[in-house]
Regions:
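Conserved metal-binding segment of the jelly-roll/cupin
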Residues: 103-125
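Non-catalytic, conserved peripheral segments adjacent to functional cores
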Residues: 1-106, 126-127, 137-188
Length: 188
């Protein structure tokens, strides 16, 4: 596994080797000990999810206010997507900053999203499937969203007709969530 830190400290892109022969391919896409060794970040998954999306589906921006926070390991296993990670930690020097990463099923790439960050993605193909490994279990009462179309975030999504859930389409702005004290806090 090769790891590179992206433009926001603590956000990592991991590339794993894909081995193949006449039978198909094999990929070890996450190993906690290797990730810790390369990043000094302890990530132990407690839940795994799959998400299937049609082309132009925009999901997010989602985040958790779980007591211990929630980090994610995101991997595309079919199709391709434009993945967005945004720092939502009030008081962080990178608050509101975001990075985009294109994930493709045949790339061997995954993204690590630390606690206190939001996540969204745009499916670039039909039959796009991503996996999420989560550091804490899903708890609906602690899950929140911010509009991925909030103009104050200056997110340059591709110019397409998005397919969105009503929940994401009507999600509040970053400023609204901040004023409501519904954002994670930065901890040194």
């Amino acid at each position: 596994m090769k790891i590179s830190e992206l433009d926001i400290p603590g956000v990592f892109k991991a590339t794993s080797r894909i081995d193949g022969d006449h039978r198909g391919t094999f990929r070890e896409w996450f190993k906690a000990s290797s990730f810790f060794e390369l990043t000094n970040t302890n990530f132990i998954p407690t839940q795994a999810n799959l998400s299937f999306s049609s082309k132009n589906t925009l999901r997010g921006i989602h985040y958790s206010l779980a007591t211990d926070g929630q980090s994610k390991w995101v991997t595309c296993v079919s199709g391709s997507l434009l993945d967005l990670v945004i720092d939502l930690r009030v008081g962080s020097p990178t608050f509101g900053n975001h990075v985009f990463v294109t994930l493709e099923s045949n790339s061997g790439d995954s993204i690590y999203i630390p606690k206190g960050f939001g996540h969204a993605f745009l499916a670039l193909e039909d039959h796009t499937c991503i996996t999420y490994l989560l550091s804490s279990e899903y708890e609906p009462t602690l899950e929140y969203e911010i509009s991925p179309l909030d103009s104050s975030l200056k997110i340059n999504w591709p110019n397409v007709d998005f397919i969105m859930s009503d929940k994401d389409l009507n999600a509040p702005s970053l400023e609204s969530q901040k004023v409501s004290n519904l954002l994670p806090k930065f901890r040194d």
